[in-house]
């Protein structure tokens, strides 16, 4: 019976992240518009856009290979699985043994790898520019992410997200400077990985400074819908990761009554709403930086991750 309940909860989480991802994107757009004194699109507009793209015909370039065709499905599958592994409203899920931060980073890296190859596949100028910039950002963001994982794993004694969340929510952790530095570094990495301002502007489609949008200019129809949905899932994944590691309160422990799941889901949705609103506030108060300044931005994230690890070792040796 317990296995069946765990299976139902795991399926509920997979469905929940899939349904909430477009809503989170709509919330960010709505709050940004309100902050700029505009009405903005409705919250359900991303669902309408996805439905419209799903109905449209797929148009492919003459020289597009099989890689260009399968990449949207690979990106969507990898991102959805990675987002489903992050504990959102309950720990100890059925696949919690595989909810390892290193595995999640590997899944996201695989999706990025195929997207960069797809951008190069058709041989357009924008695709090549976007792919090269994406690889440049990834080469700087992944080392910073590894240092963040290293810091939190040393504190929690594990790289499994359920174990980390259960340990960090306990009273044994207390206030640690290293955790604060890791949080700031993770926020900076999340901004870069999701192509948000100031690293990139997701609202641009025909600018020389774009990164993510440059790689997907040749996609249309259901392929573009899957890529847009994957981008929303990735944003939800990083907000869920921040909530799981640094705001784990509200997570229902494994073995709790089924009625507690509603409290966990409500707490999770509240965290997403706060995180999306803060992201919108941040993006409306800062300008996009030049592409050549991005290495400095991610270099600062890497230094914060290194400093967090160093302070952790120093505090343990005292």
Enumerate the language-model features and the residues they cover.
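Alpha-helical transmembrane segments
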Residues: 9-20, 96-109, 172-193, 263-264
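Transmembrane alpha-helical segments that form the membrane-embedded catalytic/substrate-channel core
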Residues: 23-31, 110-119, 184-201, 273-282
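Juxtamembrane inter-helical linkers in multi-pass membrane proteins
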Residues: 37-54, 201-223
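Cytosolic juxtamembrane amphipathic/interface segments immediately preceding
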Residues: 49-68, 125-129, 216-223
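Mid-bilayer segments of alpha-helical transmembrane spans in multi-pass integral membrane proteins
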Residues: 84, 103-118, 139-156
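Juxtamembrane/interfacial segments at transmembrane-helix boundaries in multi-pass membrane proteins
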Residues: 93-97, 151-181
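Interfacial loop-to-transmembrane junctions
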Residues: 278-304
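Juxtamembrane boundary at the C-terminal end of a transmembrane helix
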Residues: 308-318
